[in-house]
C-alpha cells in the first residue's frame, strides 16, 4: 500500500471517476504502482486515472509549484469541461467523502472551498493558517507563518489548510492563467492563489470532522520520517482511528502476488511469531519475534532476531540475532547477523539517520549495499 492510495480511494469511494495524477521527476515507481493497481477504471464510461507528467508546453522546466502543475494541464481541464475541480495532495493519510465537501462548496456559492483541520498552535507553522468569519468565509490565509494566529476563544489551537481545494472550474482556469503571467509568482496555491482569492473572491473553509461524532477526523501529513513512522504505528492499534479493515470505505491498492505470510519454529529463543503487528504476503518469520511493527511484502526475518516498533519495507532481509527497535528499514536492505539498530542513538548516528523523535532510518546506501531498484 502507498500513501497515494488514500486520496485515490477517497475519490473512487466518493463517486469521482475522472482523476489525473500529476507526477514530477523520478516517478517510475509511482507510475508502475498506478498502472498495476489502478487500471480497473472503465474507459468506455469516461472513467480514468490518468498520469500527467510535466507537459513543458509553456517552458522547458518541470512543475514549478502546485499551481503551475495544474496550469500545465489546463488544456485537459478544458477538454473535459467539468463544473468543479478538486485539487488534492498525494502525501496525506485520511478517509474523506469528497461529496460532502463538494455539496458544501455549492451551498455556499463559493469560488473556492478549502478543506481544513484544527491542530495545536505549536504545529501550525508547518501549514497554511486560516481565519474565518461567523459564516465560515475565509478572511485571511497565511502560508506557514512564524507566528500563527489561534482560533477565537481557543488560544492553543489553529485552523489550517489540509491542501484540499474545490474550485469552480471556470474560475480556476482564469486564475491559473492570471498567475502564469505574474513574473515573481511562486505559482503555488498556498503562497499565491489562495491569498489573492481571499482578498478578491468567495473563499470558504470546510472543517474536516468525523460524520459520526462531529469531532476532528483522522488526518495525517506524513512528510517527515517521524510522522511517517507514527502513522504506521497508529494503523496497528487495537482500535485504530483509521481502520484499514473497514469494508464500508475500502482503501484500494495493488496487492503484490505472493504466498501468505509464514511463521516457522516454535523453540524457546527462536519462536516465529508476530504480536500487535501487520505482516504482508510473502513474508517469512523464521524463528524471529515481531512486535508492534509493520512488515511490507517479502520480508524475511531470521532466527532469534527481534523487531519492535518498526516499519520494514519490501524485500528486506533481517539476519539471525538482529535487534531492530523504532526504525524504518528501506526496501531491499540486508541486515547482517547480529546487527543492532535503535538501541544506541550515538552509535546509530554514526551509520544511519536518526530523527528528532529517535526514529532510525536505514537505507541500502547506508549499509554500503547496491540498490536493486531505481529511486
Question: Which residues make up each language-model segment?
Answer:
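Left-handed beta-helix
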Residues: 170, 178-375
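Unchanged
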Residues: 1-239, 348-365, 370-375
Amino acid at each position: 500500500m502507498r500513501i497515494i492510495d488514500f486520496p485515490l480511494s477517497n475519490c473512487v469511494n466518493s463517486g469521482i471517476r475522472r482523476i489525473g495524477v500529476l507526477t514530477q521527476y523520478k516517478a517510475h515507481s509511482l507510475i508502475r504502482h498506478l498502472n498495476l493497481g489502478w487500471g480497473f477504471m472503465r474507459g468506455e464510461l469516461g472513467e480514468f486515472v490518468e498520469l500527467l507528467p510535466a507537459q513543458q508546453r509553456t517552458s522547458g522546466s518541470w512543475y514549478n509549484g502546485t499551481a503551475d502543475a495544474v496550469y500545465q494541464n489546463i488544456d485537459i481541464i478544458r477538454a473535459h469541461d467539468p463544473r468543479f475541480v478538486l485539487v488534492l495532495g498525494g502525501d496525506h493519510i485520511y478517509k474523506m467523502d469528497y461529496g460532502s465537501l463538494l455539496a458544501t462548496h455549492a451551498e455556499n456559492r463559493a469560488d473556492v472551498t478549502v478543506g481544513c483541520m484544527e491542530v495545536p498552535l505549536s504545529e501550525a507553522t508547518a501549514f497554511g493558517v486560516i481565519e474565518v468569519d461567523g459564516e465560515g468565509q475565509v478572511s485571511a490565509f497565511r502560508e506557514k507563518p512564524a507566528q500563527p494566529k489561534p482560533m477565537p476563544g481557543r488560544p492553543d489551537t489553529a485552523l489550517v489548510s489540509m491542501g484540499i481545494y474545490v474550485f469552480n472550474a471556470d474560475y480556476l482556469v482564469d486564475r491559473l492563467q492570471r498567475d502564469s503571467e505574474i513574473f515573481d509568482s511562486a505559482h503555488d496555491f498556498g503562497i499565491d492563489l489562495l491569498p489573492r482569492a481571499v482578498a478578491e473572491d468567495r473563499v470558504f473553509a470546510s472543517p474536516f470532522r468525523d460524520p459520526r461524532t462531529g469531532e476532528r477526523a483522522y488526518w495525517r501529513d506524513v512528510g517527515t520520517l517521524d510522522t511517517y513512522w507514527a502513522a504506521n504505528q497508529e494503523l496497528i492499534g487495537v482500535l485504530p482511528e483509521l481502520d484499514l479493515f473497514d469494508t464500508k470505505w475500502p482503501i484500494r491498492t495493488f496487492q503484490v502476488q505472493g504466498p501468505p505470510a509464514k511463521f516457522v519454529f516454535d523453540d524457546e529463543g527462536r519462536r516465529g511469531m508476530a504480536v500487535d503487528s501487520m505482516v504482508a504476503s510473502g513474508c517469512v518469520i523464521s524463528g524471529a519475534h515481531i512486535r508492534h511493527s509493520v512488515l511490507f511484502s517479502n520480508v524475511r526475518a531470521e532466527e532469534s532476531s527481534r523487531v519492535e516498533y518498526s516499519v520494514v519495507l519490501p524485500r528486506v532481509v533481517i539476519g539471525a540475532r538482529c535487534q531492530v527497535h523504532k526504525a524504518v528499514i528501506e526496501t531491499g536492505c540486508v541486515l547482517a547477523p547480529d546487527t543492532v539498530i535503535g538501541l544506541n542513538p550515538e552509535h546509530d548516528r554514526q551509520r544511519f539517520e536518526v530523527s528528532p523523535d529517535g526514529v532510525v532510518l536505514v537505507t541500502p546506501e547506508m549499509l554500503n549495499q547496491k540498490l536493486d531498484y531505481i529511486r
